[in-house]
Amino acid sequence: MLDLKFIREHPGTVKHAIAVKGVNLDLDELLRIDRELVELRQRVEALQTERNANAKLVPKATPEERPHLIQKGKDLAEDIKALEPQLRAHEDQLRQLLLRVPNIPHPSVPVGQDDSENVELRREGQLPEFAFPPLDHVELLERQGWSDPERVARVSGSRSYLLKGDAVLLEMAVLMFALDFLRGRGLTPLSTTALVRPETLVGSGHFPGGEDQVYKIEGDELMLAGTAEVPVNSLYAGEQLSYEELPLAFAAISAAFRSEAGSAGRDVRGLIRVHEFRKVEQYVMTRADEAEALRWFGAILENAEGLLRALELPYRVVQNCTGDMGAGKVLMYDIETWVPSEGKYRETHSCSYLGDWQARRTGLRYRDEHGKLVYAHTLNNTGIATPRILVPLLENHQQADGTIRVPEALRPYLGGREVLGVPVRAAAAEAKSPRNK
């Protein structure tokens, strides 16, 4: 949510953000309701002032004047009461429209309609060169007996998954490694629930507009969040922190749930797009200093890149265009990791800076060095998400016999093992393990 004063003073800037982000919002309607609300409040305040002045006259009035003044006070009270429904309706309308106002993108953000217009910034790591026909992650899991897609589909339907044996240990190793890695970078580990109240999804910016992506608990006012960003963003809702308490930086682990509405037919097979997953999320609350916030943006981006380098996975960083960055984002970079079976990079991380857009929604403020109450700034980035990260991990580290080479960083979490699985296919005499170009 943007400052209403800023919207009034910079309607052209806000309209441009609405246009380039593809937001369905009539800013002129918002400004009209705002003007009408100002007028209504002025009328109510004028009536209240008149009523208060009238009330002061009653004790001093003569017996002849008093009945008239008392009646006038009642009439003024009725006039005020008659305006209250209009006042509340305008306040509600304005609030709902303000929640849809997008943030202003950073000047560096490219203008575009969708992810096809994102801009690649850099590539890291060398793509694997296999001396054998590589398998995709589904085949690798099935040949090792690490999955059971048919049975789990009968239990949970499409976009569900089940891991067995060493695949479970690998998933847990990745999550624990990510937590340890981020803790070493100064983030506080946090384990949080995925169950949240609807207002937390408003606070994070997922509502209004993303309702079809969220699972609801019938018979209860609770929903299942798709990221730990949602509950962590509301942990300090309505609070006033001190200058010294910020920044707060968390590595939050939780289950995550997404309905994947609008994804029919996309990534149905395998682990790329599932309804339930586990995720370690980086989340930062910092002071209202854009330079400081952008330093944090660089830090949590580097954290994610450091994790991928430690997992020995090739990746690229792209800057999201205006049409692919979400309403609340000032700046957003995606990290995409190489998936050999698809011959392309797939998104595994999203790094975002939101200014005070979320803090205004939750009421998170702090006292600056001058004692003034100001809204905090927030940032977030994926630490690691499973099982999606297992896709590039399995495929990039597969060996000719179908076993998986364990990256050195994960070996302490797997009892020192260097290889997972057993040989499940004959390797050609000349075949070698993946080697780097």
From Swiss-Prot:
Localization (cell): Cytoplasm
Annotated keywords: Aminoacyl-tRNA synthetase, ATP-binding, Cytoplasm, Ligase, Nucleotide-binding, Protein biosynthesis
Gene Ontology biological process terms from the UniProt entry: selenocysteine biosynthetic process; seryl-tRNA aminoacylation
Record keyword Cytoplasm present: yes
Binding residues for ATP: 258-260, 274, 347-350
Binding site for L-serine: 227-229, 281, 382
GO cellular component terms given for this protein: cytoplasm
Gene Ontology MF: a single term: serine-tRNA ligase activity
Keyword Transferase: no
Recorded superkingdom: Bacteria
PROSITE patterns linked to this entry: AA_TRNA_LIGASE_II
Xref: NCBIfam families: serS
Functional description taken from the UniProt entry: Catalyzes the attachment of serine to tRNA(Ser). Is also able to aminoacylate tRNA(Sec) with serine, to form the misacylated tRNA L-seryl-tRNA(Sec), which will be further converted into selenocysteinyl-tRNA(Sec).
Recorded family membership: Belongs to the class-II aminoacyl-tRNA synthetase family. Type-1 seryl-tRNA synthetase subfamily.
Subunit structure: Homodimer. The tRNA molecule binds across the dimer.
This protein's domain notes: Consists of two distinct domains, a catalytic core and a N-terminal extension that is involved in tRNA binding.
Name of the protein: Serine--tRNA ligase
The organism's taxonomic lineage, starting at the top: Bacteria, Thermotogati, Deinococcota, Deinococci, Deinococcales
